[in-house]
């Protein structure tokens, strides 16, 4: 199973939030590029970036930091990014910079047809990010919980060419309370698209549980606060995941 370190960007710095609250940001690094290099050196085979300011503004807000990260590691490992991606022009600009994939979140919920258009324009490069609270999709940087169930939304994207779905349980994100395995597996089994778990990864027991769920469609996991605060040693966790494959 692939473990993917997260680098959340706020005003050019690497931070972690609790439950998506910008006022609950903990700064972990003033140099996101150095952070990216660190995770690469620890054995990361992919990086997950989030433009937090962009998620709220609806347009890219951390381009200098993103460019620095890509200059540091994009030649070695694929980098994906979400946050503020609302149109095809932005997707094209990001891919031209060297990103491997882009993640459509809020725009996928508000306008599912946009996902189909993006997949046609950039085949194989589109990931859908579905963030949920109690199974219901959240949008606009998690500020609004909609009346749409994530499974119903995910099924709409099955034939569009989406390469994966990132499922985040926002009640768990940054809270160190464990991954919501049941909800992640339920989503993975409901669709033909690989699902990446996100939110709440706490320790090696979560890694073992996720690896056990791999045969049921859970293709990987994004980890953030746990690897920054040290409750998970990333290199050790990836080695464990590899040994359980």
From Swiss-Prot:
Specify the pathway: Amino-acid biosynthesis; L-histidine biosynthesis; L-histidine from 5-phospho-alpha-D-ribose 1-diphosphate: step 4/9
Q: Which chemical reaction does it catalyze?
A: 1-(5-phospho-beta-D-ribosyl)-5-[(5-phospho-beta-D-ribosylamino)methylideneamino]imidazole-4-carboxamide = 5-[(5-phospho-1-deoxy-D-ribulos-1-ylimino)methylamino]-1-(5-phospho-beta-D-ribosyl)imidazole-4-carboxamide
Establish whether keyword Cytoplasm is in the entry: yes
Report keywords, A-Z: Amino-acid biosynthesis, Cytoplasm, Histidine biosynthesis, Isomerase
In the UniProt entry, which residues are flagged as the active site? 8 (proton acceptor), 131 (proton donor)
Q: Which Gene3D superfamilies match?
A: Aldolase class I
Family annotation (InterPro entries): Aldolase_TIM (IPR013785), His_biosynth (IPR006062), HisA_bact_arch (IPR006063), Isoase_HisA-like (IPR044524), Isoase_HisA-like_bact (IPR023016), RibuloseP-bd_barrel (IPR011060)
Domain of life (superkingdom): Bacteria
Amino-acid biosynthesis as UniProt keyword: yes
- Where does this polypeptide localize? Cytoplasm
SUPFAM superfamilies in the record: Ribulose-phoshate binding barrel (SSF51366)
- Primary location recorded for the protein, binned into one broad class: cytoplasm
Q: What is its EC number?
A: 5.3.1.16
GO terms assigned for molecular function:
1-(5-phosphoribosyl)-5-[(5-phosphoribosylamino)methylideneamino]imidazole-4-carboxamide isomerase activity
Name the GO terms of the biological process aspect: L-histidine biosynthetic process; L-tryptophan biosynthetic process
Identify one Gene Ontology CC term for this UniProt entry. Answer: cytoplasm
Q: Pfam families per the record?
A: His_biosynth
Family, per entry:
Belongs to the HisA/HisF family.
Q: Which HAMAP family match?
A: HisA (MF_01014)
Q: What is this protein called?
A: 1-(5-phosphoribosyl)-5-[(5-phosphoribosylamino)methylideneamino] imidazole-4-carboxamide isomerase
Q: Which organism is this entry from?
A: Neisseria meningitidis serogroup A / serotype 4A (strain DSM 15465 / Z2491)
Q: Which gene encodes it?
A: hisA
């Amino acid at each position: 199973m692939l473990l993917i370190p997260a680098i959340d960007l706020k005003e050019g710095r690497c931070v972690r939030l609790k439950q998506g609250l910008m006022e609950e940001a903990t700064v972990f690094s003033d140099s996101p590029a150095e952070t990216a290099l660190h995770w690469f050196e620890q054995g990361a085979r992919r990086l997950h970036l989030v433009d937090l300011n962009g998620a709220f503004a609806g347009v890219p807000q951390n381009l200098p930091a993103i460019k620095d990260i890509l200059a540091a590691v994009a030649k070695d490992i694929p980098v994906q990014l979400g946050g503020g991606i609302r149109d095809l022009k932005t997707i094209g600009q990001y891919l031209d910079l060297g990103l491997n994939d882009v993640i459509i979140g809020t725009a996928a919920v508000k306008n599912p047809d946009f996902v189909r258009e993006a997949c046609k324009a950039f085949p194989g490069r589109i990931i859908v990010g579905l963030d949920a609270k109690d199974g219901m999709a959240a949008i606009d940087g998690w500020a609004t919980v909609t009346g749409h169930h994530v499974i119903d939304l995910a099924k709409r994207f099955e034939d569009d060419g989406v390469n994966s779905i990132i499922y985040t349980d926002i009640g768990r994100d940054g809270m160190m309370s464990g991954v919501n395995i049941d909800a992640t597996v339920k989503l993975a089994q409901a669709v033909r698209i690989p699902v990446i778990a996100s939110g709440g990864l706490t320790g090696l027991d979560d890694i073992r549980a996720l690896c056990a769920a791999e045969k049921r469609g859970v293709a990987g996991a994004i980890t953030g606060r746990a690897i920054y605060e040290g409750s998970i040693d990333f290199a050790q966790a990836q080695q464990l995941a590899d040994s359980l494959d």
